[in-house]
């Protein structure tokens, strides 16, 4: 490491102010911070010093996604190899086949499942990262500021929220929209009012709905095959619930399968166990707000319970209880990773409770009442992002009025 440190120290003058490569300093800076902690020192007389800086915070969040990421790759392989064996077609039908064939299509081998999932997920993640970091570098050079480590988190969250069969050009287009439109045009990290990863996914959801939703996109190789065996469905539990309610859910899936993650879905959203590990890490390090998490759970519980009480003979989603809402769709993934994003969420303590409740209520309303969107977590969080400044303003004004009233007494 001393050799690398000396190498960076020798090269730094060329990239610093007045150097021959001054305008490319953001590129140098991102590689330096990749290997070493920032060497910047506080220069202003008024400051707050904390061991948990932005770089370390983003690294922790990135590492917290690993349980969901690795289980997601396993689940892609598990679901897909089972399907390919069912139709007796040991070939995905596209370029992935040449890589998958290194270990083979035997569905009962653990390494085959992990490898199959990696063959589909890693190209999506790599595309997302490379395209996104290119935009970050471009804007950093134009604005002459350092590259923030927040993109490492945005890229992995975007990739984990995508189906495994997503075309790579769409992954590139989605992260481009999320970074450029969702963040950079507002000034970059810390100034965006929408979650960049969700903004990119929402763009794909409305621009290319057949590739981001439906029954075929959740299992790799399914879209390449012309034959679907009788009685087989790639539908997610949420899609089944929207069509046939709790009876359909329990007929095709057990609650524990949904909790463990042995179901079709986006790469990182299926396993509540893996997501819970991440939640514990983020809460223990105080990166995520427990107020937002509890508020979201409370809003979901109350709203779904009210719909259960009201009931409906025509809409089966009315009767789906809260414990099913928790384990199907992207509720848990959005709750832990997306809703707690500090920049686009509420900043006051009371505001975080309200913000979380708004998400919990809205996601159930979209799932139950709106037949066009069986999955509501993405739209619920983006809607709450828009309300976050208003919520914080109301909380601050309420505190001012309360203090004025006490002062006048």
Which stretches of residues belong to each language-model region?
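A beta-strand-loop signature enriched in Asp, Gly, Thr, and Trp
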Residues: 293-349
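Long hydrophobic alpha-helical segments that form multi-pass transmembrane helix bundles
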Residues: 190-276
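Structural signature of hydrophobic alpha-helical transmembrane segments
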Residues: 114-128, 165-174, 261-272, 318-331
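N-terminal signal-anchor module of multipass membrane proteins
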Residues: 1-121, 125
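Loop-to-transmembrane alpha-helix initiation sites
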Residues: 172, 193-198, 322-330, 352, ...
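Central hydrophobic cores of alpha-helical transmembrane segments in multi-pass inner-membrane proteins
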Residues: 124-138, 175-183
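Membrane-interface helix-loop-helix junctions at boundaries between adjacent transmembrane segments
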Residues: 146-227
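Generic transmembrane alpha-helix motif of multi-pass integral membrane proteins
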Residues: 154-164, 181, 276-282, 333-339
